Amino acid sequence: MASKSKGLVVLALLLAAAILVASADEHPQAKKEENEAGVENFFHGGGGHHGHGRGGHGGGGYGGGGGYGGGGGGYPGGGGGYGGGGGGYPGHGGEGGGGYGGGGGYPGHGGEGGGGYGGGGGYHGHGGEGGGGYGGGGGYHGHGGEGGGGYGGGGGGYPGHGGGGGHGGGRCKWGCCGHGFLHHGCRCCARADEVPEVRN
């Protein structure tokens, strides 16, 4: 009888462990799918010319350095913000690297999160394969360079300079059809027949 109850306890423990492992495996996948489904094109206003952005909450204007939409900002091309380069010190990705944020990895390397919608990457902030995209370019030590830009604005620039702006400041092809991430900017319309919202 004792061995039977001991067996039941072991079985219950194994079942609980299996549930924990399954939920741990499932969570990152769900988060990844949520991110992929929710990637938005920010509205950046003007591209910004050498915005001297210092990261944070909008330094250098929406399109230029730092802030939500633009390049790296911060110190040696780091910074971050929602749309720009990799966050942290000397371009380190830190928690903000990759995903919406942009480049990441060590000294501005793209790492897993480099490229895509976020922006730069490559060696010391070079655009590399991940440079450009919607978020913004890279260039040497975070410079926007000629390869910097895409829709989102220039790359980080040297010690946090905004870089060269980008092409058209990230205007939406068919207008805004909703709020952007955390109600900043906008969500671009996905199709030509989607009705843009009236913006105040």
UniProtKB/Swiss-Prot annotation:
Coiled coil start-end: none
Family: Belongs to the GRP family.
Organism per entry: Hordeum vulgare (Barley)
Location in or out of the cell: Secreted, Cell wall
Chain's role: Responsible for plasticity of the cell wall.
Regulation: induction: By wounding.
Keywords for this protein: Cell wall, Cell wall biogenesis/degradation, Repeat, Secreted, Signal
Secretion signal, residue range per the UniProt entry: 1-24
A Gene Ontology BP annotation from the UniProt entry: cell wall organization
Record's protein name: Glycine-rich cell wall structural protein
Major location (coarse): secreted
One cellular-component annotation, GO: extracellular region
